Amino acid sequence: MERCVFYISDGTAITAEVLGHAVLSQFPINVTTFTLPFVENAARAQSVCKQINEIYQDTGVRPLVFYSIISLEVREIIQRSEGFCQDIVQALVAPLQGELGVPPQPVLNRTHGLTESNLDKYDARIAAIDYALAHDDGISLRNLDQAQVILLGVSRCGKTPTSLYLAMQFGIRAANYPFIADDMDNLQLPAALKPFQHKLFGLTINPERLAAIREERRENSRYASLRQCRMEVGEVEALFRKNQIRYLNSTNYSVEEISTKILDILGMSRRMF
């Protein structure tokens, strides 16, 4: 089954995307998505409405429309479209208002916008991103005392995307260090990392998956051979066990799942931005 899906917002549309995707993931359908942020006025809403209606006329199937919009005028224009429209925030606001006994006070871009109230959190997240970039792939072993977690693993097992996701999503200062082929003859935990053993977390991966990933980068190379991948993964997992470093097999997990599991295993607090 194929459906067109619109994520519409007067802000970034991140909320509409996240909640809409979470709902649609429950259904066995294929989707073509249109994300339309900053639909802030009637003229823009009319243009979006026209786009929705044209797809309906061309396909005969109503597009699915998930929206998060403060302006009543803009909401009503979207609701008059030929799409199957779901106001994902208002559906929760009404019952919550009854429970809290307090009327909502909607403010444009409050969720993902930059305001005086969240400036400190924003600065902390940017600092975490800068830290992750400066300490990616063992570039620098300085200031590891400032790291909240240090990821270890073979090349291409997911360390870099996980470090950056932890920084961007949760403001976690994450460093990462790779074990490369030249290390394997006498693999040991680097002296610079030993004082921070409580911060170390290992990532591993099935050798077959690792070989496929490396093959895309260096085709027909020793680096990408299954034999090499099996050897490296085996050596690094043995190092993790020897040094009692907690680790996770990343093969079947997304970067979001890997990051969340690391926080859970290490007992680290999540911060929302």
Curated annotation (Swiss-Prot):
MF annotations from Gene Ontology: ADP binding; ATP binding; DNA binding; phosphotransferase activity, phosphate group as acceptor; protein serine/threonine kinase activity
Coiled-coil region list: none
Alphabetized InterPro entries for the sequence: Kinase-pyrophosphorylase, PSRP, TF_DNA-bd_sf
Protein keywords: Kinase, Nucleotide-binding, Serine/threonine-protein kinase, Transferase
Pfam families with a match to the protein in the record: Kinase-PPPase
This protein's record includes keyword Translocase: no
Residues reported in the UniProt entry to bind ADP: G153, V154, S155, R156, C157, G158, K159, T160
Reactions the enzyme catalyzes: [pyruvate, water dikinase] + ADP = [pyruvate, water dikinase]-phosphate + AMP + H(+); [pyruvate, water dikinase]-phosphate + phosphate + H(+) = [pyruvate, water dikinase] + diphosphate
GO biological process, one term: regulation of DNA-templated transcription
EC code(s) of this entry: 2.7.11.33, 2.7.4.28
Function noted in UniProt: Bifunctional serine/threonine kinase and phosphorylase involved in the regulation of the phosphoenolpyruvate synthase (PEPS) by catalyzing its phosphorylation/dephosphorylation.
Family as reported in the entry's similarity comment: Belongs to the pyruvate, phosphate/water dikinase regulatory protein family. PSRP subfamily.
PANTHER family reported in the protein's UniProt record: PYRUVATE, PHOSPHATE DIKINASE REGULATORY PROTEIN 1, CHLOROPLASTIC
Name this polypeptide is given: Putative phosphoenolpyruvate synthase regulatory protein
Organism of origin: Yersinia pestis
Lineage summary: Bacteria, Pseudomonadati, Pseudomonadota, Gammaproteobacteria, Enterobacterales
